[in-house]
């Protein structure tokens, strides 16, 4: 059953199967906090895991990037074991830039910050 966007978003957390693209969050922990913590409104998978919540508390409180990566490794292993989601696709991102364009770097959110470029 395919619904128009306006109707889909009224039901997306209660459907048996839904496809959601989680994008445009500066930190990986943000998506996990929004989508998989017990009881949060956008937890469409209804994932409920005390160890996950505890690890996320630790990750959120860890400012050192290298240390946070170690905690998030445990989070990802737990999610792979528990299976709250299925990763159906990996989005390919391609960018073409002329060599005359200086200062261009692909941003992780796929936004283009044109004020940083020059020709």
Regions found by a protein language model. Name each.
Residues 1-4:
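Short beta-strand-to-loop elements that line the ligand-binding cleft
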Residues 8-119:
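Detector for C-terminal structural segments
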